[in-house]
């Protein structure tokens, strides 16, 4: 199995409810190491650029508004097959469809306020990590 890195965001709905530690515990208890982490308040420009792939989708403006509504925690997670493992731990985007025990089943409020974002591929993980972190900020 390959050791890889993935990118994660703990979203405003979760930071607002002080769930960062509980979500971090899920990652760590399931074989993912947090090798970089910082709490940030996204600007509208940052959120629009980060989610630019969704610009033409009907939910884009609501997504950006939500992501700037409060602080987020951006993270680099490392472990065996980290991208796939993180996606398993997060659960389905819609918390009503998420398997019991997943982060979204436990903590999400709605399909929009679903507590976490995770990279969908190793390629996108590299892009997303570079968007928020300099190489020197990642400490394995």
Curated annotation (Swiss-Prot):
What main location does UniProt list? cytoplasm
Q: What keywords is this UniProt entry annotated with?
A: ATP-binding, Cytoplasm, Kinase, Magnesium, Metal-binding, Nucleotide metabolism, Nucleotide-binding, Phosphoprotein, Transferase
Q: Does the keyword Phosphoprotein apply?
A: yes
What GO CC annotations are associated with the protein?
A: cytoplasm
Q: Can you tell me which family this protein belongs to? A: Belongs to the NDK family.
What is the gene called? ndk
Specify whether Cell wall biogenesis/degradation is a keyword of the entry. Answer: no
Indicate which residues the UniProt annotation says bind ATP: 11, 59, 87, 93, 104, 114
Q: Which reaction does it catalyse?
A: a 2'-deoxyribonucleoside 5'-diphosphate + ATP = a 2'-deoxyribonucleoside 5'-triphosphate + ADP; a ribonucleoside 5'-diphosphate + ATP = a ribonucleoside 5'-triphosphate + ADP
Q: Which residues form a coiled coil?
A: none
Q: Where in the cell is it found?
A: Cytoplasm
What cofactors does the UniProt entry give for this protein?
A: Mg(2+)
Q: Which organism was this protein described from? A: Granulibacter bethesdensis (strain ATCC BAA-1260 / CGDNIH1)
What is the name attached to this protein's record?
A: Nucleoside diphosphate kinase
Q: Where is the active site?
A: 117
Q: Tell me how this protein assembles.
A: Homotetramer.
